[in-house]
Amino acid sequence: MRSLIAAVERIDPLTIYGRVAAVNGLLIEVRGGLTRLAVGARVEIERFGQKPLPAEVVGFRETRALLMPFGPVEGVGPGAEIRIVPEGAVVRPTKAWLGRIINAFGEPIDGLGPLPQGEVPYPLKTPPPPAHARGRVGERLDLGVRSMNVFTTTCRGQRLGIFAGSGVGKSVLLSMLAKEATCDAVVVGLIGERGREVREFVEETLGEEGLRRAVVVVATSDEPALTRRQAAYMTLAISEFMRDQDQEVLCLMDSVTRFAMAQREIGLAAGEPPTTKGYTPTVFTELPKLLERAGPGPIRPDGTTAAPITALFTVLVDGDDHNEPIADATRGILDGHIVMERAIAERGRFPAINVLKSISRTMPGCQHPHERDIVKGARQVMSAYSNMEELIRIGAYRAGADPVVDRAIRLNPAIEAFLSQDKEEATSLDDSFGMLGQILQSEY
């Protein structure tokens, strides 16, 4: 009964109409009703013989509003009525959403029945907490992945980027984190994924164990740009709800690049000028607004701090170019980056992380002194081997010429084995440092 009363109270007695004036490509031009329309407003467009088409106001041109639809425009004709959605873009999540798969509109797509709706609406687009009103990063987080636990030790509330080309194991790494990281809830956003890979990721890669404490938000590559962008906002909105329930949240998004591509498509359709590699100015405006929503929780009025949102965002580097515009912009916003390389994947070592190029900006503050010594020693050994690798492979290096290189050659097989990890295997933080410490103290 309470939910029914709340639904009735949300009904806006004032309904504003406009009418479709023209349809040009991705845009629908509307006349009338402009006194209540603003950029970002949600509307519904009547279609002949079909359900109303949801759309969003993306701009204005003289006396007409420019709408972009969330679906195909078939059935939309001149004079079709436009109705403003008074509540705007909100979602009403509950903790019962854990274990469910939803689309960008918060609707279930897993065939398990309707989702219960919460009483509190969460706007899909909210500003990040002010810098002076949010806590600091917390204690370190056990991710269950040896290479990340040691070389990119992560604190609760930290935001990391996973930078990789296509087909090097990003999705498998995300599934390992979703299953093994020590947190209360996981929110996974699959933005612009291939349709056939979604079920494979959920059933095989993530599995029943990983899904049990997760909410998965899906927008496939064939869906409109607005829908793909909204899926990213939905992922953060659900993460913020879980945070407000005092749940320590791990937010995983694959990928930020496809969010940026969706925003570029929207901007170009609205008439924005293209800049670097065709990306519009709003892409670089929206990126920090999205990424900064994750992190340490805001400070409450009573002085306590809300639970953190630890986030890992994948960045699909174009042509394995780690300095392309989105990768470069994202790297400057986040608190660290994990670099995955195709060459490492091609030689069969997974996760294919190049630990020498990966950085966590909360290190070394979240490591004990003896752990810092282990990481420093391992980096020195791996760097020495990397610098001489070509000479070693062609047989040009003579044993005994450099004791440091000789030791690196002896230890390299064991270090490579340490960095390699099966997707069903988990290793704790303490065990990760202990294993690497034993390798450095031994001789092979």
From Swiss-Prot:
Q: What EC number(s) has UniProt assigned to this enzyme?
A: 7.1.2.2
* Reactions listed under catalytic activity: ATP + H2O + 4 H(+)(in) = ADP + phosphate + 5 H(+)(out)
Record keywords, A-Z: ATP synthesis, ATP-binding, Bacterial flagellum biogenesis, Bacterial flagellum protein export, Cytoplasm, Hydrogen ion transport, Ion transport, Nucleotide-binding, Protein transport, Translocase, Transport
GO molecular function per UniProt: ATP binding; ATP hydrolysis activity; proton-transporting ATP synthase activity, rotational mechanism
Task: Show the InterPro entries listed in the entry.
Answer: AAA+_ATPase, ATPase_a/bsu_AS, ATPase_alpha/beta_chains, ATPase_F1/V1/A1_a/bsu_N, ATPase_F1/V1/A1_a/bsu_nucl-bd, ATPase_T3SS_FliI/YscN, FliI_clade3, P-loop_NTPase
Where in the cell? Cytoplasm
Q: Name one GO biological process term.
A: protein secretion by the type III secretion system
UniProt feature coiled coil, ranges: none
Q: Does the keyword Cytoplasm apply?
A: yes
Q: Which SMART domains match?
A: AAA
Q: Which PANTHER family match?
A: ATP SYNTHASE, SPI-1 TYPE 3 SECRETION SYSTEM ATPASE
Q: What does this protein do?
A: Probable catalytic subunit of a protein translocase for flagellum-specific export, or a proton translocase involved in local circuits at the flagellum.
Task: Give the similarity note.
Answer: Belongs to the ATPase alpha/beta chains family.
Q: What is this protein called?
A: Flagellum-specific ATP synthase
The species is Caulobacter vibrioides (strain NA1000 / CB15N) (Caulobacter crescentus)
